[in-house]
Amino acid sequence: MLKNPHTKYRPANPFAGVVPGGRGLSDRTWPDNTITRPPVWMSTDLRDGNQALFEPMNSERKMRMFKMLVEIGLKEIEVAFPAASQTDFDFVRELIEGGHIPDDVTIEVLTQARPHLIERTFESVRGAKRAIVHVYNAVAPNFRRIVFDTDRAGVKQIAVDSARYFVEMAARQPGTDFTFQYSPEVFSGTELDFAVEVANAVIEVWQPTPQQKCIINLPATVEMSTPNVYADQIEWMHRHLARRDSVLLSVHPHNDRGTAVAAAELAVMAGADRVEGCLFGNGERTGNVDLVTLALNLYSQGVHPGLDFSRINEVARTVEHCTQLPIHPRHPYVGDLVFTAFSGSHQDAIKKGFAVQQPDAVWEVPYLPVDPADLGRSYESIIRVNSQSGKGGIAYLLEAEYGLVMPRRLQVEFSAAIQRITDERGTELSAGDIWRAFEEEYLAVAAPYAYVEHHLAEHGGQQGISLTVEEAGVRRVLRGVGNGPIDAALHALDAGAVLLGYEERAIGQGGDARAVAYIELADGEGGGSTFGVGIHANIVTASVLAIVSALDRLAQRRERADGVGRQVAATR
């Protein structure tokens, strides 16, 4: 690092020559505003997020992502850059021709400001009921000088010509209700007077009305300043955009400085109507703004975001599958450890908070900004597993002594069982004690189902299973068909559970090696999720054992919940 970084770096100053002193608004009003309703959300997971992956999503993952975004409640979804590849073009066509787009959802497609690309983009959405077509060109001074070797007039003309071509192309497809969107790329580093000049020139071409609005999107393509500077930029544009009542003012913050969430929130306070981003902050470089954090920040303040994250673990597993990227264990609201306390004083305060928290009262549990149950999660306390414990921790002991490597979320779940035992004994547990507790919790559970045997067979191109279990002392043969042994076994048991995750590992090496399978299932009746574990020399058998284990533990959880419910009812 340089001793004098000012010789190489300068703070961005988009207000130079626009306001007196050139250092932001002196009459800003956004600090006095609060967010009382959610903005329009637009997911770009399938476009900006997808293009930033090591390996872009295949068609199966794209469709799975799209359907999940719809289930969450997204009404605007950017699905592709159709002129960039045949794969993207074909995906848009599949969405339209396959009837996958609900009536209340609008897809969005992106194009650069070039006639042949615009034409290809409009062709991709032919037959759609509604579509947002989004065009952009970079307008910042370093792009004008270094990338395009042109001046302000040249950049502005590109935008205006593209806007005119949009009108012409839309007229050729009268069956589609089009919304036009324009982004002055790298707005965050552009002189404000020029940014508004270009945006207003585009608006003049499109002639939007309050009934047929256009979208002007102001991206922090590269985050260059503190969030308050971005908010000042948005408020200035909010004041100076032409036909403001006919324009949806949109923002697209990136996270280069780590403050995209704050920038988006302040931008909404400053007048933005709409926010573009990705689930869990995927996207180029450091990512786009995280729509989940934004939405749940609103929720924690008593404002419903209009998006449903009541099964956030399932959303997280789907995103990890589709993107092949892990979610950080400390990620707000969704990370495996965010509802976990290692500190004894934190654990004590949280337990006391839960003890006095009334079901219909304002949430006041210390250290927890929202009720984990609202997100389909639970408070999970890991005890004696950090550096302050004086021991290696539960997971370390099981791995070191028994070769068992547990998924992080299973570590969290199993720690609750260890907590109960240590509370009862009042002493520390040995590795043997922990292993016996693990066997009892996951491997020896046999009610309502006890596994007996299974047989696999091909069934019309799918996997069929004949599964023998013992239930209440009676043997039953259950049959199911699925995409593989796990899917087939779930269908055979017909328990209404949803598969959230599956992992398999080896215990030991050589001829004595065994397989361990971990299955995470969500209760279809809304009771959260739980793990099952199976260990066997055969990996398929281990997997079936894990499914039976998980279903047995879900059933026991339901029984405990019903018992608590009866006790509460009896005291009323």
Curated annotation (Swiss-Prot):
One of its GO terms (biological process) is L-leucine biosynthetic process. Its EC number is 2.3.3.13. Keywords: Amino-acid biosynthesis, Branched-chain amino acid biosynthesis, Cytoplasm, Leucine biosynthesis, Magnesium, Metal-binding, Transferase. One of its GO terms (molecular function) is 2-isopropylmalate synthase activity. Its cofactor is Mg(2+). Its main location: cytoplasm. Homodimer. HAMAP family: LeuA_type2. NCBIfam families: leuA_yeast (TIGR00970), PRK03739.1 (NF002991). Belongs to the alpha-IPM synthase/homocitrate synthase family. LeuA type 2 subfamily. This is 2-isopropylmalate synthase. It comes from Azoarcus sp. (strain BH72).
